[in-house]
Swiss-Prot record:
Organism: Citrobacter freundii
Family: Belongs to the iron-containing alcohol dehydrogenase family.
Name of the protein this chain belongs to: Glycerol dehydrogenase
Swiss-Prot/TrEMBL keywords: Glycerol metabolism, Manganese, Metal-binding, NAD, Oxidoreductase
Catalytic EC class: oxidoreductase
Length: 365
């Protein structure tokens, strides 16, 4: 099987990147259709529009109604056609960015995504999650290429709620461990082949960056300021983790995350918070050295990620609920089957309960 790595054509990061990106956007199109919800348009819209206008790029801004659905995508495409725009810019969170990607795909136009948070590694990916108008999952749209440009304005991201940056660290925490599992299993990644050494190296750099810079970056985010540590964590959460997961693969941690989504008491958690606990469970499942498990426990505690079921909200009927989670984790087609050994609901159940006890013991020290 071929080894494959993929990534956005261009990645920009730094304070005021959402204004400075125009000098690169002019190489993609001479007019852009810009979408954002009302809150984000007030927060960052002026910077983005000024960044385009300063390079003689025309644009039309349109309100995103909040759901990445086929109805909303088609509504926005109709408006885009009226204005004849030749590129798409999405500003905001995951659903806005996914909608921008979809519009660009269907209209065969270049896409620029400008996240206002660093809570997941999704912005760099060639993927959108499509929902119904009622907000229920409908399908994944897999694209033939990644966004043409990803723009991370760290001055904006530093002002976002700290918990979102920490959740991004939780998502990124899994990248190295899942990438290594997929590499060892010679699993097929979302890029359509086996992992390259380059993708695996980025995944490892992601983990090393989290350990070195994560706690410092959390303090910077609490102060609402940009520091070198925050810059490095934004890059780890977004670019390093994004290339690492897409071009190396997902395994135990994300499958366990998906299993936890069946529990109503976990619905308040962000994606990365569930993934962080899933990472601990994967480490138990693959019988990682105790030193490695304790390193991850220490990191999670210092930045504020959950390490016990109680912190996840699971406090009663634990055995039965975790067996249900384990069965969902092992469903056909789940990424748990990318682990380099056979996995059963029983082994996942055991790993989750053991991870919980390890977390309890760590917090009680």
């Amino acid at each position: 099987m071929l080894k494959v790595i993929q990534s956005p054509a261009k990645y920009l990061q730094g304070p005021d990147a959402s204004t400075l990106f125009g000098q690169y956007a002019k190489n993609l199109a001479d007019s852009f259709f810009v979408i954002a919800d009302d809150f984000v348009m007030k927060l960052a819209g002026e910077k983005v529009l000024n960044g385009l206008h300063s390079h003689d790029i025309s644009c039309h801004a349109e309100r995103f109604n909040g759901e990445c659905s086929h109805i909303e995508i088609n509504r926005l495409i109709a408006i885009l056609k009226q204005h004849g725009c030749r590129g798409v810019v999405g500003i905001g969170g995951g659903k806005t960015l996914d909608t921008a990607k979809a519009i660009g795909y269907y209209q065969k136009l270049p896409v620029v995504v400008i996240p206002t948070i660093a809570s997941t590694d999704a912005p760099t990916s060639a993927l959108s999650v499509i929902y119904t108008e009622a907000g229920e999952f409908e399908e994944y749209l897999i694209y033939p290429k990644n966004p043409d440009m990803v723009v991370m304005d760290t001055a904006i991201i530093a002002k976002a709620p700290v918990r979102l940056l920490v959740a991004g660290m939780g998502d990124a925490l899994s990248t190295w461990f899942e990438a290594k599992a997929c590499y060892d299993a010679r699993a097929t990644s979302m890029a359509g082949g086996q992992s390259t050494v380059a993708a695996l190296s980025l995944a490892r750099l992601c983990y090393d960056t989290l350990l070195a810079e994560g706690e410092k970056a959390r303090f910077a985010a609490q102060a609402g300021v940009v520091t070198d540590a925050l810059e490095r964590i934004v890059e780890a959460n977004t670019y390093l983790s994004g290339i690492g997961f897409e071009s190396s693969g997902l395994a135990g941690a994300h499958a366990i995350h998906n299993g936890f989504t069946i529990l109503e008491e976990c619905h308040h958690l962000y994606h990365g918070e569930k993934v962080a606990f899933g990472t601990l469970a994967q480490l138990v499942l693959q019988n990682s050295p105790m030193e490695e498990i304790e390193t991850v426990l220490n990191f999670c505690q210092k930045v504020g990620l959950p390490v016990t079921l109680a912190e996840m909200g699971v406090k009663d009927d634990i055995d039965g609920k975790i067996m249900a989670v384990a069965k969902a984790t092992c469903a056909e087609g789940e990424t748990i089957h990318n682990m380099p050994f056979s996995v059963t609901p029983e082994s996942v159940h055991a790993a989750i309960l053991t991870a919980d006890l390890l977390g309890q013991q760590w917090l009680a020290r």
